[in-house]
Design a protein with these regions (language model features):
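Extracytoplasmic cell-surface/polysaccharide-interacting catalytic and binding patches
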Residues: 1-130, 134-244
Length: 244
């Protein structure tokens, strides 16, 4: 089957991955010729095994949860999914709101550091929306509102997503032209957060640009996403070996 040493080396490298499919070897090999070197074998496998990953014309699948959660119009959380270690937002300095909003304890320290950074730059930061249960999202959902996700398809159900702004702009599109947005969009990755629905990535995320919506993914991942100008879907396609 293999004609030369280059083929043998390619076969050896790609066959080590658990999603390698012997029957698709020729497809892998031919596609590899269009990729820059060194070959990203994870991306190559994903591209051939899951050619429609970055589109939303398939039936939905349960959310991918490893290494982090991916929720979008294609991947959903069940109605019984409740993140562990939810805590009240109003317990923490700089984050106080007079309501019962909750966030995952996983993001509290990182968010506190982000808020401190914003305050040092003479800006304020307020959480407008955090964790939402499946049932609460059900009450919010309106099929004709592109900013409202279907129940199970909202990142807010993870407890890792927050809508943040200041009192002046709130959750308005005008936030994108503000000094606060400039600070957030160019520095949030230092604290493990990403702008989840960036401008010009709407077809990949499945949602319109939201300058207020940030998602915690951890500093290692957030820095890659920022440096390579990726959205979370592109990160998964490029760096996470898909199995769904």
């Amino acid at each position: 089957m293999l004609s030369n040493n280059i083929d043998e080396e390619f076969y050896y490298n790609i066959s080590k991955y658990k999603t390698f499919n012997e029957e698709k070897f020729l497809e892998y090999y031919l596609e590899s010729k269009s990729l820059t070197k060194p070959i990203n074998y994870i991306y190559l496998l994903n591209k051939i095994n899951y050619p429609h990953f970055l589109s939303f014309n398939e039936n939905p699948y349960l959310a991918i949860t490893n290494p982090i959660i991916l929720v979008n119009p294609k991947f959903y959380l069940g109605d019984d999914y409740i993140p562990k270690n939810l805590i009240l937002v109003n317990q923490f300095d700089h984050i106080k709101r007079d309501n019962e909003m909750q966030i995952s304890n996983e993001i509290v320290d990182a968010y506190q550091r982000l808020v401190d950074f914003i305050y040092l730059n003479n800006q304020q930061l307020i959480i407008y929306s955090a964790y939402r249960s499946y049932n609460y999202q059900k009450t919010l959902y309106k099929s004709d509102n592109p900013y409202t996700a279907k129940p199970g398809h909202s990142e807010h159900q993870t407890g890792l997503a927050i809508d943040i702004s200041n009192f002046y702009y709130g959750l308005s599109s005008n936030l994108s032209s503000s000094e606060l947005f400039k600070l957030l969009s160019t520095n949030a990755h230092h604290f493990g957060f990403i702008l989840r629905y960036p401008e010009s990535k709407e077809k990949l995320t499945g949602y319109p640009f939201e300058p207020w919506h940030y998602r915690y993914v951890g500093e290692d991942i957030s820095k890659i996403i920022y440096q390579e100008d990726l959205c979370l879907e592109e990160y998964f396609y490029k760096y996470v070996l898909l199995t769904y």
